[in-house]
């Protein structure tokens, strides 16, 4: 019987992995389907050094540079998630929907996010259709309609892929798709960087960069795995007046929000670059470039990026972990934190602890994200510039999160086997 259950468990995991890989392959195939009617070679040559396109390419796996069917990628969905989550904290009716209506409320919030993503994708696709006008062979309103419809449908498909991966596959769908898009561009990135710097690069430069990135990877794994264990005592233990040898703990991660603050902050950072493409006022464009990293003075950009990561770390953590809910659950289980009174005192203790952990985790995320920019500014070393702290955080963070999800899935199935 146990052998049969184990084989079913392994087959279920294999099915999830195969399903995830299938959707990943489909998302990559759509990236290489070009929109007809565009002079893609001329377009690529004109935008190869555009920071806005470079950023969007990270999220679309190169689809934006070639104006593929999936050129918008997961960006509209991410932006929609930010908008809806901000609205949820600001609008009482949405906040009530999320906190008091359980799974039904969550489904309504998800549906609202989809609608906002659809509108956002439509707006972006119309903007792109006007942006590529100089490179279109026969530009007219029919082309605008066809291209906008194609890009919007492509973005909605990517959104559906990401949701299906999260629900029926392995890993977090949006993060995993961004991860695949980043690593798909690594070979080309490494080749171009080596070719552009092989005449100037020194052996010491390579050693320094490899050392820095190695330290960053170790640090990212440390921050992803860091946990503060809070001892919990049950009513039975409390009645005895002492803790048992087998102490229970409430684990709080140092970085509750994973790589999502980085993704959200990056999505916001693209707005100044996008607006700079649209405005004609030179002074306003100069001000916008101070926030998109293309200005020679990057201090304001780095401060803006740093602040966004801190904000989204607190914001996203507040969405996924509510100290008041944890306090209520402990009370229902007739348990309490050792040395802390149940109820309001427990909520305040958890909130204080969570704030400290989030601050430390956010500081580290922000530091890792801006380190490559600081090194480039101080040393003028730009080797592997495209693989910045943001990309590195996403690559390592998603790998760690996905492996942990697989382990959790296997453990949960083992518990099911024991119960049976």
Swiss-Prot record:
InterPro entries: SecY, SecY/SEC61-alpha, SecY_CS, SecY_dom_sf
Alphabetically ordered keywords of this record: Chloroplast, Membrane, Plastid, Protein transport, Thylakoid, Translocation, Transmembrane, Transmembrane helix, Transport
Pfam assignment, any one: SecY
Membrane topology category: Multi-pass membrane protein
The keyword Magnesium appears for this protein: no
Family the entry assigns: Belongs to the SecY/SEC61-alpha family.
Known partners and oligomeric status: Component of the plastid Sec protein translocase complex, which is composed of at least SecY, SecE and SecG.
Protein name: Protein translocase subunit SecY
Organism: Guillardia theta (Cryptophyte)
């Amino acid at each position: 019987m146990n052998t049969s259950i184990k084989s079913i468990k392994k087959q279920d995991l294999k099915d999830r992995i195969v399903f995830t890989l299938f959707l990943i392959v489909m998302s990559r195939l759509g990236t290489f389907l070009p929109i007809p009617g565009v002079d893609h070679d001329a377009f690529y040559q004109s935008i190869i050094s555009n920071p806005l396109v470079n950023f969007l390419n990270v999220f679309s796996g190169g689809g934006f540079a070639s104006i593929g069917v999936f050129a918008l990628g997961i960006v509209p969905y991410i932006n929609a998630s930010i908008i809806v989550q901000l609205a949820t904290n600001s609008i009482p009716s949405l906040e009530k929907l999320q906190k008091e209506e359980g799974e039904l409320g969550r489904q309504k919030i998800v549906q609202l996010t989809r609608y906002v993503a659809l509108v956002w994708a439509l707006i972006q696709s119309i903007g792109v259709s006007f942006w590529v006008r100089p490179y279109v062979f026969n530009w007219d309103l029919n082309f605008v309609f066809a291209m906008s419809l194609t890009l919007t449908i492509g973005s909605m498909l990517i959104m559906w892929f990401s949701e299906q991966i999260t629900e029926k596959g392995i890993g977090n769908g949006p993060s995993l798709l961004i991860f695949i898009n980043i690593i798909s561009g690594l070979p080309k990135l490494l080749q171009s960087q080596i070719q552009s710097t092989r005449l100037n690069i020194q052996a010491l430069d390579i050693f320094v960069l490899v050392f820095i990135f190695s330290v960053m990877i170790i640090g990212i794994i440390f921050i992803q795995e860091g946990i503060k264990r809070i001892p919990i005592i049950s009513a039975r233990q409390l009645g005895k007046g002492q803790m048992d040898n087998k102490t229970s703990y409430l684990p709080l991660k140092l970085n509750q929000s994973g790589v999502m603050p980085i993704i959200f902050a990056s999505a916001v950072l693209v707005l100044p670059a996008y607006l700079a493409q649209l405005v004609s006022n030179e002074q306003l464009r100069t001000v916008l470039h101070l926030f998109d990293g293309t200005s020679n003075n990057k201090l304001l950009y780095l401060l803006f990026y740093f602040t966004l990561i801190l904000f989204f770390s607190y914001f996203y953590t507040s969405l996924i972990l509510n100290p008041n809910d944890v306090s209520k659950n402990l009370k229902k289980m007739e348990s309490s934190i050792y040395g802390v009174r149940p109820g309001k005192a427990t909520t305040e203790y958890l909130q204080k602890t969570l704030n400290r952990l989030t601050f430390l985790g956010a500081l580290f995320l922000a530091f890792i994200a801006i380190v490559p920019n600081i090194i480039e500014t101080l040393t003028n070393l730009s080797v592997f510039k495209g693989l910045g702290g943001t990309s590195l955080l996403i690559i390592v963070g998603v790998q760690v999160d996905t492996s942990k999800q697989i382990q959790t899935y296997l453990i949960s199935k083992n518990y099911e086997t024991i119960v049976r």
